Amino acid sequence: MTLQKQIYLKASKSDVWAYLTDPDKLAIWFHKPTKPLAEGDDYEMFGTESGDKLMWGKVVTANPHDHLSYTFTIGPMGDATSTVSWTLDDVAGGTRLSLTHEGLPAGEAAFGLTLALDKGWDDHLARMRESLHAA
């Protein structure tokens, strides 16, 4: 199963990149890692309020200001690993940010997880937009 999202942001690619890789910026809209996301590094992200480990994986690709991808695992997925990829494109007035979350468990039994992740990405991206547009 694959989820895809796309949003437009009134921000430069470098500002959007910071929101995807910098722990303090990630904490605003997503979950906070222990260190900046960098190619080849393992990562863990924690709830900003709970402090609980929520997701983990490895940064596969980090081409600054253009493309970021990492493996993505959360507790409800068990041992399954998916991949999150971000692509940043210049557009007049800002940046188009595209998300592809692929390799999610398929089938009727896993559809509840897909629905939760779909809504979660919508909520997270709305927070990113709100924060970037307020800056």
Describe the residue ranges of each PLM region.
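A conserved amphipathic terminal alpha-helix motif
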Residues: 103-135
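Short beta-edge strand/loop motif at the mouth of beta-sheet-based domains
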Residues: 3-5, 15, 21-56
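Hydrophobic-ligand binding "helix-grip"
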Residues: 35-36, 49-93, 102-105
